């Protein structure tokens, strides 16, 4: 209160405590603001430290699966998210890998399948830009969640790039404090995604280097087997096994023309000669028509293909089989056959890199096969040439000299007066005649050795062809030097094949049958059919005859069911030298 322009001393005294109180309030607010700023600075420093630590973690490993899991775990920890996931896709935007965190295995099992790149996830794959949502279900691209999927609301998605190419996306949902993701969260995750891109690229390069090393080793093993003298036809199983291992697939098969010398354009069907994997165990000896568009492109045109579904005509067991690689065995202008690799995984089980690598592997295997086949034929030609030379030498030199010696001894007989000596000279002349006759027989055998191969082939083929009218689909394979099989054993072989095929037609009710004749230290005959299999008790004169023939020849006879499928395998063997 004032009096004559003067301030009342009592009023001044009352204002001083008020000013003091206001000053204290402003100081408290300032201290609180400073404390908040300090906390923000500390929090920012901690988050930066967390980002650096996360970058170090995700770039530390070279295993792709482990690297992806490290990225997801680091991202969820960095922004305090309840759920996290990362997908990796190929150039066709097919999801190849999907790792997740926050969902237990029981829930995953009940959901039944992983995301397929649809909805908001598909949007980020098609348009790789950061996306932050307060309610993911409200987005126009959202298609909802499958049954048993945990509810999710807030969402942050960031593309993972390498050299401006997006090959994956990092997803985070539901901060544990219930708040939406912030601008700072997005910046941090983008920084982590940049490091993740480098880490994934390094892991993929390492994976490709390991795969290429395995490819080199597999190619070397096959070439070594072939060039060491192993029968080329038997190495196809190694080709199928190595193809299975290189691709981590579930099954593989090799199919070749029945006549390897026939031009590819004239081949009507391929014979499945080797399989690896239980899913294809029952189709050995079956044939595949080349009429199908994909198979014809691969075999006739020599173009490797990757398909999401393969339908090989005539093989009902593989109807609508999953992803597959179809690889031509190309070598010097020809295609020796086809390797088919099958996976039970979904689309994208095989990558472009795998197709390229496996096509090169098949080419190298086919080239080694062709070289080995050429070497085998050259060796056979050398043997036949040597036999012709030996036959000529025996005829032109040895027989003539023996004949001259015989004439000389025969001329000396009348001049010898001792009857005992005359008899001994006559016996020697007779022995020389026997030797000459044996040599002539040997010459005939040497000249006929090359025809012997054809004769045995023709006899076996004729024994099988006898049942052509029964509707049985048959294939015959020959492995080894057939010329070393003598006539007696060839007779046995023909009888065994005839009896085995007859049993398959009359008793097994088979529709397909494969005969494999292999000559090594023994003559081995294997007849496989897809019939009813072995009965609980089986008897019959035919089987008894086969067993007796094996015993008389010093060999073995067995009859067993086809492992993992219907049908019977008959094996008969006998040593070459009796």
Swiss-Prot record:
- Disrupted gene: resulting phenotype? Cells lacking this gene show no changes in gene induction following hypoxia, or exposure to NO or CO. Another publication shows a severely attenuated response to CO. Cells lacking both this gene and DosT have no response to hypoxia, or exposure to NO or CO showing both proteins are required for the hypoxic, NO and CO responses. 95% decreased induction of the DevR (DosR) regulon during anaerobic growth, 50% decreased induction of the DevR regulon upon exposure to NO during aerobic growth.
**Chain positions with N-acetylthreonine modification:** 2
Q: Which residues carry this modification: Phosphohistidine?
A: 395
Q: Which residues form the GAF domain?
A: 63-200, 231-369
Naming one, the record's GO cellular component terms include:
cytoplasm
Phenotype for residue 89 to R: Decreased autophosphorylation when CO- or NO-bound, none in the deoxy or O(2)-bound state, protein more easily oxidized to Fe(3+) state
Which PROSITE patterns does the entry link to?
A: HIS_KIN
Specify where the region named Histidine acceptor domain lies, as residue ranges. 386-452
| Mutagenesis / variant outcome for changing residue 139 to A | No change in heme binding
Question: Which Gene Ontology terms describe the biological processes this protein takes part in?
Answer: detection of hypoxia; detection of redox state; response to redox state
Residue ranges of every copy of the Histidine kinase domain listed in the record: 383-578
Q: Which InterPro entries match?
A: GAF, GAF-like_dom_sf, HATPase_C_sf, His_kinase_dom, Sensor_HK_TwoCompSys, Sig_transdc_His_kin_sub3_dim/P
Q: EC annotation?
A: 2.7.13.3
Q: Name one GO molecular function term.
A: phosphorelay sensor kinase activity
Changing residue 395 to Q does what?
No autophosphorylation. Isolated kinase core binds ATP
Result of mutating residue 397 to A/Q?
A: No change in phosphorylation
EC main group: transferase
Q: What induces it?
A: A member of the dormancy regulon, expression is controlled by devR. Induced in response to reduced oxygen tension (hypoxia). Induced in response to low levels of nitric oxide (NO) and carbon monoxide (CO). It is hoped that this regulon will give insight into the latent, or dormant phase of infection. Member of the Rv3134c-devR-devS operon.
Query: Quaternary arrangement and interactors, per the entry?
Result: The isolated histidine kinase core (HKC, residues 386-578) is a dimer and autophosphorylates, suggesting the protein may function as a homodimer.
An additional note in the Swiss-Prot or TrEMBL entry is: Was identified as a high-confidence drug target. A tyrosine residue (Tyr-171) is required for discrimination between bound gaseous ligands. The Tyr is part of a probable hydrogen bonding network which includes Glu-87, His-89 and Arg-204 that is probably also important for signaling to the kinase domain.
Q: What does this protein do?
A: Member of the two-component regulatory system DevR/DevS (DosR/DosS) involved in onset of the dormancy response. Regulates an approximately 48-member regulon. Required for full induction of the DevR (DosR) regulon; acts later than DosT to positively regulate expression of the DevR regulon during adaptation to anaerobiosis. Characterized as an oxygen sensor; O(2) acts as a switch, with O(2)-bound Fe(2+) protein inactive in autophosphorylation. Has also been suggested to act as a redox sensor, or perhaps as a dual oxygen/redox sensor.
Q: What is this protein called?
A: Oxygen sensor histidine kinase response regulator DevS/DosS
Organism source for this protein? Mycobacterium tuberculosis (strain ATCC 25618 / H37Rv)
Gene name tied to this protein: devS
């Amino acid at each position: 209160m004032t009096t004559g322009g003067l301030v009342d001393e009592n009023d001044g005294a009352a204002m001083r405590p008020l000013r003091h109180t206001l000053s204290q309030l402003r100081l408290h607010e300032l201290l609180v603001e400073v404390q908040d700023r300090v906390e923000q600075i500390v929090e920012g420093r901690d988050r930066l430290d967390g980002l650096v630590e996360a970058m170090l973690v995700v770039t530390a490993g070279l295993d792709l699966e482990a690297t992806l899991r490290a990225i997801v775990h680091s991202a969820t920890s960095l922004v305090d998210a309840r759920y996290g996931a990362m997908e990796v896709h190929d150039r066709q935007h097919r999801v190849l890998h999907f790792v997740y965190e926050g969902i237990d295995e029981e829930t995953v099992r009940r959901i039944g399948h992983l995301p397929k790149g649809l909805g908001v996830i598909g949007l980020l794959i098609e348009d790789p830009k950061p996306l932050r949502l307060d309610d993911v279900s409200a987005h126009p691209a959202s298609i909802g969640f499958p049954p048993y999927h945990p509810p999710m609301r807030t969402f942050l998605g960031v593309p993972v790039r390498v050299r401006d190419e997006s090959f994956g996306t990092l997803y985070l949902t539901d901060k544990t404090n219930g708040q939406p993701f912030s601008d700072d969260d997005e910046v941090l995750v983008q920084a982590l995604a940049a490091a993740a891109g480098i880490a994934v690229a390094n892991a993929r390069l390492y994976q490709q280097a390991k795969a290429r090393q395995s490819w080199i080793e597999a190619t070397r093993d096959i070439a070594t087997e072939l060039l060491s003298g192993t029968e080329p036809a038997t190495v196809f199983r190694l080709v199928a096994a190595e193809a299975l291992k290189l691709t981590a697939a579930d099954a593989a098969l090799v199919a070749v023309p029945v006549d390897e010398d026939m031009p590819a354009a004239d081949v009507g069907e391929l014979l499945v000669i080797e399989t690896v994997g239980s899913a294809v165990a029952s189709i050995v000896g079956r044939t595949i028509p080349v009429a199908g568009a994909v198979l014809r492109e691969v075999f006739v045109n020599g173009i490797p293909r990757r398909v999401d579904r393969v339908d090989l005509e005539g093989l009902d067991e593989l109807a609508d089989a999953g992803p597959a690689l179809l690889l031509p065995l190309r070598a010097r202008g020809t295609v020796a056959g086809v390797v088919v690799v099958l996976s039970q995984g979904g689309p994208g089980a095989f990558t472009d890199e795998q197709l390229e690598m496996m096509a090169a592997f098949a080419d190298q295997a086919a080239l080694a096969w062709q070289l080995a086949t050429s070497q085998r034929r050259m060796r056979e030609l050398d043997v036949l040439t040597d036999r012709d030379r030996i036959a000529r030498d025996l005829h032109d030199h040895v027989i003539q000299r023996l004949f001259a010696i015989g004439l000389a001894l025969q001329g000396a007989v009348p001049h010898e007066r001792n009857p005992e000596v005359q008899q001994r000279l006559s016996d020697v002349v007779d022995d020389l005649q026997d030797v000459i006759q044996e040599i002539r027989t040997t010459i005939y055998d040497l000249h006929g050795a090359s025809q012997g191969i054809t004769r045995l082939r023709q006899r076996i083929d004729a024994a099988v062809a006898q049942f052509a009218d029964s509707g049985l689909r048959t294939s015959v394979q020959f492995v080894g030097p057939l010329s070393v099989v003598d006539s007696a054993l060839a007779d046995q072989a023909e009888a065994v094949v005839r009896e085995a095929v007859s049993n398959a037609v009359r008793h097994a009710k088979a529709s397909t049958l494969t005969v494999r004749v292999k000559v090594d230290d023994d003559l081995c005959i294997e007849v496989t059919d897809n019939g009813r299999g072995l009965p609980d008790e089986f008897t019959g004169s035919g089987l008894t005859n086969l067993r007796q023939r094996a015993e008389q020849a010093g060999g073995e006879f067995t009859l067993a069911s086809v492992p993992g499928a219907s049908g019977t395998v008959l094996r008969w063997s006998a040593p070459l030298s009796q």
